Amino acid sequence: MIEITSTPIVLMIILGVTGMAIPVINVIRKEKGSSTFYGTIAFAALIISIGFVAYQFYSDSIAPAAIFSADVLVDDAFGSFFAIAMLIVSIITVVGSFSYMKNRANPAVYFSLILLATIGMVLIAFSTDLVMLFVGWELMSIPTYILAGFNKKNPISNEAAIKYFLFGAMSSAIIIYGMSIAYGIAGSTNIGEVIQAFAVLDAEMLPLGLLAVGMLIAGFGFKMGLVPFHMWLPDTYEGSPPPITALLAAGTKKAGFAAALRIIILGTIALNLDWTLALGVIAIMTMTVGNIAAIMQKNLTRMLAYSSIGHAGYILIGISIAPFSGLGLQASLFHILNHAVMKGAAFIAVAGIVTTLAITHLDKIKGLGRRMPITALGLVISLLALAGVPPLNGFWSKLMLFGSAIDAGSLTRFSVSPSKYIFRIIQP
């Protein structure tokens, strides 16, 4: 039986119907609509979607329950939280695309692909089955491959799309191989049953369980931008259309964390691993590489790309210390939501700069406050939030993260690094 009124089904209907309708409208209209026309349709669908999820979430109407008889999707608060974060990013992306797509070709296809990618992200958040999760993963990935290279006349954009596609295909192959091993061990693709099977592995099967978890960490780590799976990220962010960079940096990254929390964390607990040490090492590597590389950049887009890598490390720190501090997981979830808003807003400001001035070099954006005061103000606020300056939202989530790290005895010196490159941008 299908619960047609469940959150993921309603979202798929709203976004799917709208996403398919936009190209159809474009074909049957005698006068082709502008980017504003199609963007408004996409924006309305996203607003209705996030309004529905927010109402369900805050009215306590969500009771964890299977949607299909096969238990492949579940309507729960975890999925709704990530759905809200992803829908916020998609809304920011669409709003930022109004000016960027003005006078550009194929706006109907562009906005339709954004909605289809959003469906994939939502499916990932609500999935409780490995097959459904992978379907959502590919539904998110394939539209973003096209969107990354949407500016076909720009060779940098073409290069970005090719790199993103090649690394994305490799990560998908790694994920499906890890899932295949998990299915071979458990005899089921249901995540709950897989975890139960992992919990009772004997010594002979334990290496296979470790291999499955390791491959899933590597595959999902690609989208999350974790070191050493981050090599594609700076070039792809630099070459993609700036609004799409916001979707990649703030949206698909969160989908990666949603998948990781659904599978990897519970899987490592079932294997009785000292998984906190492994995740902590990856988190420290990610923070270090991301922040140091960001300081060295002279291109605003690449700097924000490496900043995204660093913030992925912060989120992972909270997850890794969750067993030792009650605030760890809460802080990570709070920072996931904050980062979605902060990074999305920053890249939309960059989109405005690129559209109006066609520059991203740090030396050339000096005096931006005089030329584009509103855009400059939005960029400064988002960057200060990313740096964790009080009383902005980034400060409170970082305070929770590093407070929980102190409780767990972890190092917190890496919080200083982001301020160095952030203030390079906003200095007069």
Regions found by a protein language model. Name each.
Residues 1-428:
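Alpha-helical transmembrane segments of multi-pass membrane proteins predominantly involved
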